[in-house]
Amino acid sequence: MFKRLMMVALLVIAPLSAATAADQTNPYKLMDEAAQKTFDRLKNEQPQIRANPDYLRTIVDQELLPYVQVKYAGALVLGQYYKSATPAQRDAYFAAFREYLKQAYGQALAMYHGQTYQIAPEQPLGDKTIVPIRVTIIDPNGRPPVRLDFQWRKNSQTGNWQAYYMIAE
């Protein structure tokens, strides 16, 4: 269960206006910035989080979702049904999908208790448009590390990198 919760938590970290400060052309820097900002807020804002667990949704919305390509990820979930949906149905779906991500990641982040993370060393990007980045979550209480492999995609419209998929081991 811990792995599952950390998996969801780090998708939020991957990935998601916080993204504007980092180098948008480097997914490794974006990954590091998202993780650092999220973990810093989790550490520093525990009183607010304990008083109102829904506050985690705010952290997710502000620190993680700017790094996530929500529409692309949501379209992948819809699969073949994406093309048959009307624009109004798509808009409603993406709004609901975004709220789902905030809720799911917020619940996962509620499990934060001093974990640290390590991001894999940067690799040359070349002409790649999809890049895997491994993040390892280290628990101070000696639990086995959790490996998270994020897929970052170069947005074909903006040229910026955003996370859209994650696998946990």
Place the predicted regions along the sequence by residue:
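Short beta-strand edge/turn micro-motifs at domain boundaries
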Residues: 145-169
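Sec/Tat signal peptide C-region and signal peptidase I cleavage site
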Residues: 16-23
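Bacterial N-terminal signal peptides
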Residues: 8-15
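Surface-exposed, charged secondary-structure patches
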Residues: 103-146
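Bacterial N-terminal signal peptides that target proteins for export
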Residues: 1-7
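Solvent-exposed loop/turn segments at secondary-structure junctions
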Residues: 82, 99-100, 124, 138-140, ...
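Charged/polar positions within long, soluble alpha-helices
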Residues: 43, 106-110, 166
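Early exported N-terminus immediately downstream of N-terminal targeting peptides
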Residues: 24-105
